[in-house]
Structures are given as structure tokens and as C-alpha cells.
Amino acid sequence: MAPRILLARHGQTEWSLSGKHTGRTDVPLLEEGRVGAKLLGERLHRAPFDGLPDAEVRTSPLARARETCEIAGFGDRATTWDTLMEWDYGSYEGMTPADIQGVRPGWFIWRDGVPRGETLEQITARADEVVAWARSADRDVLVFAHGHILRSIGARWLGLGVDFAARVRLNPTSISTLGWAYGEPAIESWNDTGHLA
């Protein structure tokens, strides 16, 4: 069977709750985020996942992703990987979309990018690196990371431009599975938060 990639978004933080662009700022999880990470871990240790005993696990080195990985019960198996870090928002770090549009009307990150941060081409290259790694694996892979990079990985898995990521939501402590259908890359599940209900 061809390998799949499971995408786990980190738990809720103060900045994600308020809508601030949180790239490289190392903010911790809120208590709500820790609870969500625990529930995510319980979900991943039940059928059909059963703890993913054969999966390779990687996590962003940023605290919110690492802590989610650890609380979910995968910390001892995880390798940190800088490629999974969130988009470097440059001058827009810590700002909400409304703040940015106040000074740059019509701004849209997936079209316009960010000043003094990563370009769309750079985020695409990082997403492509993750996709290539996952497809070359001899087993399923599980990654703990961030909203924009995970959405970009989803788009690139399907062979689409990263701007497609603007059309999909990805909630904190959600799990998504990218796999195959009829021999082609497919989304098996997306933004699944059933464990939080």
C-alpha cells in the first residue's frame, strides 16, 4: 500500500485564538490546546489508528507543535524538522488579517505574500519537500505542525498551487489524512475534529 501522510495541527494558542499570524514566535499552548492535544492523542491511539505503531513521526521544532506531539503521546518517537515550521510572516508577524488590511487594503496572504518574510515560492518549496519525503517513505508518516504549512502541504499533495490552501480550513488539534484514490493523490479526510466533541 502506498504511504499516507497524517497531518496534525497544534493545539489552540492565545495568538491562534485571536487570529494573529503566528509564524516563528514561539507561543505556548493554552489549557484548551493542551486538552485538545490529549484528546487528539487518545483518538490516534484508538482504532483505526491504533497508535500508528509503524509510522514515522516528525514535528515542527516550535513549542506549540512539539508540546502537542508530546501530549498526544508521540514525543518519544518524533524527530524535529525545521521544514515543518510555520510560514515566516516577516513584518506581519503578530498581526491579524484585519490589521494588515487596514494598512494594505485588499491584501490576501495566498496571493500577496508578506514583506520581509517567506515568499509563496519558498513556502511551496518547503511543502514540496514534505510531500516528496512522505511519498518516498516505506510507511505512513505523521506530522505535527501549523495551519498554513499543513494547508500548503495538502495543496501540493494534490498537485495544486499553495493558493488552493485559502479554500480549506484547518482547526487546532485537527487530524487530516492525505492518501490515494484510483492511484492518484487524494484527501482521505480533512480537518477532522470529532475527538473534540
Language-model features: locations:
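Short beta-strand scaffold positions
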Residues: 59-60, 125, 144-145
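Acidic, low-complexity terminal tails and accessory targeting/binding regions
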Residues: 1-4, 40, 87-98, 155-197
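GST superfamily/GST-like fold recognition
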Residues: 147-151, 181
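Active-site signature of alpha/beta-hydrolase-fold catalytic machinery across serine-
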Residues: 71, 152, 156
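Residue-level preference for the first positions of well-ordered beta-strands
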Residues: 5, 138-144
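Phosphate-handling substructures
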Residues: 71-128, 179, 186-189
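Active-site-proximal alpha-helix that buttresses catalytic centers in soluble enzyme cores
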Residues: 2-76, 118
